[in-house]
Each structure stands twice: as C-alpha cells, then as structure tokens.
Amino acid sequence: MGTSKAGLAWHGSTLLRRTVGVVARGVAGPVVVVRAPGQPLPQLPVDVEVRDDDHEGLGPLQGLSVGLHALNGVADVAFCCSTDMPFLHTAFVARVVQAMDDDYDVVLPVARGHRQPLAAAYRPALAADIDDLLAAGQLKPAFLFDRCRVLRLTDDALLADRALAASDPTLESLVNVNEPADYQQAQARPAPAVQVECFGVLARNGHRGARTVRAATISSAAQAAELVFDHHVVAAVNGDQVTRDGSTPLVAGDTVTFVSADAGG
C-alpha cells in the first residue's frame, strides 16, 4: 500500500477506528491493537489497549502472539483480524466467535476461496504454542493449525447463521484492501444503509418516523438525518449500545436511535 493502513481515511473515520469498533461490538469484550513500536495510530476509544510488537518482520504469528498474550486470562476466545477489512460486519465477528466450543482451539473460516487466519477466533492460551513455533522459525499459521484443534467454517457453514446471511450474504467481511486500487474501489462504494429514528424533543422537531440513510458512523448518520449530534443528544445502536461517541462505526442493517439527553428521552 505504501503507507500505514491503520490511518487510511474511511467515510469520515479511519480503517483502524472502524475495525476496532466493529470488533468491539461483535465480541462484547476487551479490544487489543498490536502495532510496530512507535507506530502512530489514529484516535481510538480510551478502553482500547495498545501493545507494541517488538519483533517486526516475523509475520502474522508474531502479532497473534502479542495480542493473545494480552488477552490470556482475560478472555476465553479472541477474534483476531487485520485492520484492512473495510466491510467487516459485526455479525461475522459474532458468528466466528460463537462457533468456538470446548472441542476446539481455533475457529478458522475457509471462505471466498482461501483460509482466513486473520479473520479467525483463537484461544488466548495458544500464545505459548505460537512462541514455540516462532523460536523454531516456523512462521506460518499453518504450523499452528497442525498442532491444535481447528474448526474450519466454509462459506455455507458461516452463512448457516441467519444474522450473517441476512447482513453479509456474500461474505464481504473478508475483503481486504492490499493495493491502492483496492482501497480506491472500496472507498468508491456507498456507506452502509442504516435506519435512523428520533424520539423525544428531536421527534417533535420535525424528525418523526424512521428513515434509511447511508452512514458509516453515528456522526454521519446524524448529519444525513439533518440532526446536530452534540452534547444534548445521545445515540443508541440497535437499542442496546448508548453512546455520545460520534466515531462509533455502523454496519449494514443497524438502527440508530437519537434521543435528546436533556429531555431524558
């Protein structure tokens, strides 16, 4: 790409901010970002933990090791992905994580014609196994899969989940932007279609009824609905995530409810 993908612009936000927010919604748990030492990052939510990878050039297993060590003892399952997946959907993250059970150590999508080790779920305890592989110079994820229990999910198996089939029927969650042309093509596509609703004072001010808008963040949804998203307004995503953070990413099918905070709804 020629530049860090983390800070690439994405519909008024950045690729990393979007990825962090989508993963957080899909796992309902802590989020860890692994970066090169000193790598500048775009603004992230305060509860996101940033860990430095002090051993660059060892490939994806090294990054996995750092992230899994951070979550070992904190989470039972970790969804691990790259930052360059602009169409990643919360339903995809949830589908992969929820497929993990006591019989497996890894849930590996084998979809869109490829294994997807950077869109997969791992047991954090695998960090020690990965360290052994790195020490032996075995740097490919395939070496890890050879020594642990892997549940492989095909396209059909992934889409057996109704929520994912409805939200992302072609599994575009797995699309990467590896080249400048990929990024330009992705940027040219419209933002996700979401529903916007207003209640309380906002509804009485001429914004009554649900409407469909194109928006990748809460702020852009408010703008599309001709609302001023300031400290007087709160937003709820799908009725359960209440926030004043306008950078919160949205995905196709979301419903955003805006309420006047001063009026208490």
Which residues are covered by each model-predicted region?
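Core catalytic alpha/beta fold that binds nucleotide/phospho-ligands
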Residues: G137-K140, C198
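Glycine-rich phosphate/pyrophosphate-binding loop and the adjoining helix
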Residues: A157-P192
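Ubiquitin-like/PB1-type beta-grasp interaction modules and other compact soluble beta-rich domains
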Residues: Q184-G264
